[in-house]
Amino acid sequence: MKENFWSTLPRPFFILAPMEDVTNIVFRHVVSEAARPDVFFTEFTNTESYCHPEGIHSVRGRLTFSDDEQPMVAHIWGDKPEQFREMSIGLADMGFKGIDLNMGCPVANVAKKGKGSGLILRPETAAEIIQASKAGGLPVSVKTRLGYYDIDEWRDWLKHVFEQDIANLSIHLRTRKEMSKVDAHWELIEAIKTLRDEIAPNTLLTINGDIPDRQTGLELANKYGIDGIMIGRGIFHNPFAFEKEPREHSSKELLGLLRLHLSLFEKYDKDEARHFKSLRRFFKIYVRGIRGASELRHQLMNTQSIAEARELLDTFEARMDARSEV
C-alpha cells in the first residue's frame, strides 16, 4: 500500500461528506475558505463510466482537484469488482490519496440495481469490490448505512465490512429505508465502536448523520471515542461548520462566500463546462438572515449567468450599505 494518510490525521478528524452535484472542486474551495475540514471527498463518480472508452469524458470533472485540497479521496460507486480494480489503479496515477467506496446511496435507481446501499444486500459482492479496490495501492475506505430495511441489520453488515481490512469506515446512522426521514441513531454509536474494537481495531471509525458542526462532532468524539466526524447537510445551514472557534458571521461574510463561489465557478468552467443552473442549489447557503433575503434568493434563482448574479449582488449590497448609513 502507498502511504496511508489516514494514520497521520488528528483525532478526531473531520470530513466533508461526499454529496452528488455538491462537493465538486468549486464548493470544496468555498468550504476551505470558510473553515477547512481535514479531508475532502469528491462527489460520486461511477466506475462503469470511468472504465468506458467514451464515458471517461463524462466523469472527468467529478475527479478534478487541486494540490491544495490534499489529502483528496475519490468517492466511487458501481457493482463490478473488475471496474473498481481498473479505476483504483487510474486514481492512484491521478494523485488521489485514497479511495472511498459508496455502499450507502439510498436513491432508488441506484440501490435497486444492487449498487450504493443495494450492496448491503449483496455482502459477498461488497467484499469482492473492497478487495479489488486495493489494486492501486491506495488506502480503501467505505461509506455505508446501518442496514437496508431494518436497524437490526447493522451488526451483521458492519461486522462483515470490518472484516475486509479497510482504512476507515464512515457510517451514516440510518438505514436505506429511513433515508433522512428520522433522527440519526446516535444511540448505536457505543455498540458500533465496541464491535469495531473487537473485529478490526486498526480500522478507523467515522460517524455521519445529524451532525451540524465541529463542536457537536467533538462532543460525540469525546463521549464515544470515535476517530472521525463527517458533516454533510449541516454545511448547507452553516458553511462555517468546520471552524475551530465558532463565532457569529455577518451577512457581508456570507455574501462574500457567494461571490467567491461565483468566481470559482467561472474559473473552473474554463477547464470543464458547467451548467449555470447547477449553481442555484447553493444560493440558499449564503443568502439568509438578512432583510430582503427571500426576494434576493428568488431573483438569483431566475438569473441565467454569472454576470446577472453579480449585478444583483452589487445592487443588493449597495442598498444594504445605504440603509446602514441612515
Curated annotation (Swiss-Prot):
Signal peptide start-end: none
Annotated gene: dus
Record-listed E.C. numbers: 1.3.1.-
Gene3D superfamilies in the cross-refs: Aldolase class I, Putative flavin oxidoreducatase, domain 2
Keyword Protein biosynthesis attached: no
Alphabetical list of Pfam families matching this protein: Dus
Official protein name in the record: Probable tRNA-dihydrouridine synthase
Function recorded in the entry: Catalyzes the synthesis of 5,6-dihydrouridine (D), a modified base found in the D-loop of most tRNAs, via the reduction of the C5-C6 double bond in target uridines.
Glycoprotein among keywords: no
Source organism, top-level taxon: Bacteria
Keyword vocabulary terms for this entry: Flavoprotein, FMN, NADP, Oxidoreductase, RNA-binding, tRNA processing, tRNA-binding
Catalyzed reactions: a 5,6-dihydrouridine in tRNA + NAD(+) = a uridine in tRNA + NADH + H(+); a 5,6-dihydrouridine in tRNA + NADP(+) = a uridine in tRNA + NADPH + H(+)
Alphabetical list of SUPFAM superfamilies matching this protein: FMN-linked oxidoreductases
Protein species of origin: Staphylococcus epidermidis (strain ATCC 12228 / FDA PCI 1200)
Co-factor(s): FMN
Similarity field: Belongs to the Dus family.
Lineage, highest ranks first: Bacteria, Bacillati, Bacillota, Bacilli, Bacillales
Ligand binding (FMN): 18-20, 143, 208-210, 232-233
Active-site annotation: 105 (proton donor)
GO molecular function: flavin adenine dinucleotide binding; tRNA binding; tRNA dihydrouridine synthase activity
